[in-house]
């Protein structure tokens, strides 16, 4: 039997109709009627219980990365919703379609000193559009709520993908479950965008360019074969990082990027890790830049008055494979590639890296060819890195490696508060007892406030956390992490465990 609340039943029916199969659920009484419906629907949904809402949205991001379909989160009323906001912001900047469902208390109780009662409508703005899914007492309201839900779920694919927020007021009595069937709903078909064509002036510009450059920022969609072809044919110089996930194209990371002087740039993907390369391109006078993505945005990352083409980048890149000539300077640039320190070749399904030092260290340490690399580079915050890896591991078949710094780990330690995690999750915790990146910022060492108040020096260890969450704990000391990384990874990946494994490496800054 389902809830007696018509708005909850209509919401449940739309979740099924729009093929939302995975839902992260958090504890609470106000959202309990929604959770009951989700559970009652049986095999229609796979529920992922997460206690800490600060972790929940990041777990959903990890699930989306693995499954590439919208994921929902369901929380109770009050600050539970606000605790999800960092994860919703991360999803917004990476165009990840999450469905944020918040139970709410009646509007009449706001401002009356009732518990867990805050203004929730629009609380995720500007990171997620909000629809109010009000309680239904007559047919006209049902039509209106049905329309709102139809519109909301359709918006998941807008602007290249985006999170949405469904706020669901629920009045008492909450726990009456006597409805036999969910309502029938129909969904509207979306019209696919037409295939785009490269503008003629850009076709001519790239054909005549001496050293055309393709820059691939963070890329989480499937590998684009055209990029590999453009590189192999010496048609474009490809600059890509590990989180670009473009296989051998990312060898361009080992160029001396400060000496590059391209005369045309195509820019796709999200954030770049390499700040200095970005700053270098900003110094080149009148550099033509074409930004290609499926969103309505037009970031001018290199301060060059970039032009924008709204389409799937793979379509344009395949056109370039068919039309661009071989470039001698591109071939010469590739011949000057230095060898990476190490090629990452370990039996894992995916790698997740924390922000700040961790993502930069992995970029310098390894050329990662056959394993996808992920990082929360939407907002570039330290929160949620462990939870995202944990979320991915819930749906993974193989081992998932999380390389993370100490501050990020301790900040998000509740990502391990999950009874469904198993030995697939392996964590390489780099503990240099502070935020090490702050010690490498020019000029910051001049302030005596640096160690305690900026870099957050500490003496903490993850051993107690591992015990609390029933994880396998290993530790090691390393005076040179770059040299010791190989045998440390072998140690971390080879141990048998039915729960996540943490290898905490104590190393100097």
Where are the language model's segments positioned?
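Phosphate/pyrophosphate-binding active-site segments
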Residues: 1-6, 280-357, 461-509
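N-terminal cofactor/phosphate-binding cores enriched in small/glycine residues
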Residues: 3-74, 80-83, 89
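Active-site diphosphate/adenylate-binding microenvironment
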Residues: 8-12, 16-19, 26-30, 34-39, ...
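A short, small-residue-rich loop immediately preceding and capping a beta-strand
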Residues: 21-24, 46-48, 66-105, 262-269, ...
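Glycine-rich, anion-gripping cofactor-binding loops and their flanking helix/strand elements
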Residues: 83, 216-290, 301, 368-398, ...
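Glycine-rich, acidic loop regions that bind phosphate or pyrophosphate groups
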Residues: 91, 102-152, 239-334, 419-420, ...
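Thiamine diphosphate
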Residues: 101, 108-121, 366-509
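Conformationally flexible catalytic loops at phosphate/diphosphate-handling active centers
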Residues: 146-151, 155-208
């Amino acid at each position: 039997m389902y809830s007696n609340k018509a708005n909850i039943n209509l919401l449940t029916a739309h979740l099924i109709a729009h093929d939302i199969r995975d839902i992260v659920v958090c504890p609470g009484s106000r959202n309990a009627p929604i959770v009951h419906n989700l559970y009652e629907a049986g095999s229609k949904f796979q529920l992922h219980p997460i206690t800490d809402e600060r972790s929940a949205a990041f777990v959903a991001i990890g699930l989306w990365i693995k499954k590439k379909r919208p994921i929902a989160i369901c929380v109770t009323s009050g600050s539970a919703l606000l605790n999800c906001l960092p994860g919703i912001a991360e999803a917004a900047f990476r165009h990840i379609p999450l469905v944020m469902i918040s139970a709410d208390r009646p509007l009449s109780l706001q401002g009356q000193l009732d518990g867990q009662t805050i203004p929730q409508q629009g609380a995720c703005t500007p990171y997620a559009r909000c629809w109010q899914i009000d309680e239904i007492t007559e047919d006209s309201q049902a039509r209106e709520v049905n329309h709102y839900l139809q519109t909301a779920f359709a918006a998941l694919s807008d602007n290249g993908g985006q999170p949405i927020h469904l706020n669901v007021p629920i009045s008492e009595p909450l726990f009456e479950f006597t409805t036999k069937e969910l309502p029938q709903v129909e969904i509207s078909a979306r019209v696919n965008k037409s295939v785009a064509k490269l503008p003629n002036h850009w076709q001519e510009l790239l054909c005549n360019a001496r050293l055309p450059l393709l820059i691939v920022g963070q890329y989480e969609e499937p590998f684009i074969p055209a990029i590999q072809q453009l590189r192999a044919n010496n048609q474009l110089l490809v600059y890509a990082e590990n989180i670009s996930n473009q296989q051998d194209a990312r060898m361009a990371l080992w160029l001396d990027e400060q000496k590059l002087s391209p005369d045309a740039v195509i820019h796709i993907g999200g954030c770049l890790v390499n700040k200095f390369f970005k700053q270098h391109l900003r110094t080149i006078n009148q550099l033509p830049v074409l930004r290609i993505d499926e969103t309505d945005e037009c970031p001018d990352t290199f301060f060059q008055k970039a032009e924008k083409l709204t389409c799937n980048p793979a379509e344009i890149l395949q056109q370039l494979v068919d039309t661009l000539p071989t470039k001698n300077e591109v071939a010469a640039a590739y011949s000057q590639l230095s060898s990476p320190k190490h090629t990452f070749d370990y039996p894992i399904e995916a790698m997740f890296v924390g922000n700040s030092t961790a993502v930069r260290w992995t970029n310098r340490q390894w050329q990662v060819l056959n394993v996808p690399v992920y990082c929360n580079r939407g907002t570039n915050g330290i929160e949620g890195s462990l939870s995202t890896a944990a979320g991915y591991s819930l749906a993974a078949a193989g081992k998932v490696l999380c390389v993370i710094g100490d501050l990020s780990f301790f900040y998000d330690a509740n990502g391990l508060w999950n009874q469904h995690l198993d030995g697939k999750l392996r964590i390489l915790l780099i503990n240099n007892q502070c935020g090490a990146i702050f010690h490498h910022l020019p000029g910051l060492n001049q302030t005596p406030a640096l160690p305690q108040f900026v870099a957050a020096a500490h003496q903490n260890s993850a051993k107690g956390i591992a015990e609390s969450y029933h994880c396998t704990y290993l530790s090691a000391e390393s005076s040179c992490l770059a040299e010791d990384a190989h045998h440390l990874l072998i140690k971390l990946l080879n141990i048998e465990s039915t729960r996540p494994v943490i290898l905490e490496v104590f190393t100097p800054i």
